[in-house]
């Protein structure tokens, strides 16, 4: 059964985030041609800051669009030295500063926070031990995350996560299941 047209807005820091998310969403059954990517300009200063400051604007666009068509929004931002909850709180503060509501419970708006960064997850998903404080090297090519993302799809589709799964990765799977999966399931009915 095909899914009717859904636009997913992907707000992210860089091409590695984009490649990782596109492969994940495709593996979860979404049409990757229906993803609109808003990515930090490469020479535009802090990518984290760009994503954080762009979030309220894209949230407004999402709220308007969802009245017209089934839509979702996913923001990906590295935790760096902060915690997952710290990054989520920063998004809320950006919305508060613009006097707008952060996220309603029924909104298909997910915030994904790789800790320390996306390379931590890729390293783990490729079968290595990790800790979320260490910095792991970038891939030579963004598309090199294929095996890692395929393993993530298996993890997110399983009922139980392994005990050594990084907490931020578990939180991301939970965020997807809670915020994005209900929209997809409703489109399949």
Model-flagged regions — what are they?
Residues 13:
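Phosphate-binding/switch region of NTP-binding enzymes
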Residues 10:
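Conserved SAM-binding loop
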Residues 43-53:
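Eukaryotic endosomal/vacuolar membrane-trafficking regulators centered on PX-domain-mediated PI3P pathways
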Residues 1-7, 16-41, 54-189:
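C-terminal accessory helical subdomains adjacent to catalytic cores in phosphodiester-
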């Amino acid at each position: 059964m095909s899914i009717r047209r859904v636009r997913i807005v992907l707000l992210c820091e860089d091409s590695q985030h984009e490649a990782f998310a596109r492969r994940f969403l495709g593996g979860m059954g979404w049409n990757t041609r229906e993803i609109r990517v808003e990515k930090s300009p490469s020479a535009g200063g802090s990518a984290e800051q760009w994503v954080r400051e762009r979030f309220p604007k894209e949230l407004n666009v999402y709220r308007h669009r969802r009245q017209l068509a089934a839509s979702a929004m996913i923001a990906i931002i590295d935790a760096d030295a902060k915690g997952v909850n710290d990054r989520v709180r920063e998004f809320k503060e950006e919305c508060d500063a613009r006097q707008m509501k952060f996220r309603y419970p029924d909104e298909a708006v997910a915030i994904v926070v790789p800790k320390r960064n996306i390379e931590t997850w890729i390293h783990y998903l490729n079968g290595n031990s990790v800790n979320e404080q260490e910095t792991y090297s970038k891939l030579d090519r963004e598309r090199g995350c294929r095996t890692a993302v395929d393993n993530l799809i298996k993890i997110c589709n399983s009922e139980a996560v392994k005990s050594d799964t990084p907490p931020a990765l578990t939180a991301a799977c939970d965020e997807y299941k809670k915020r994005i999966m209900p929209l997809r399931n409703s489109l399949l009915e």
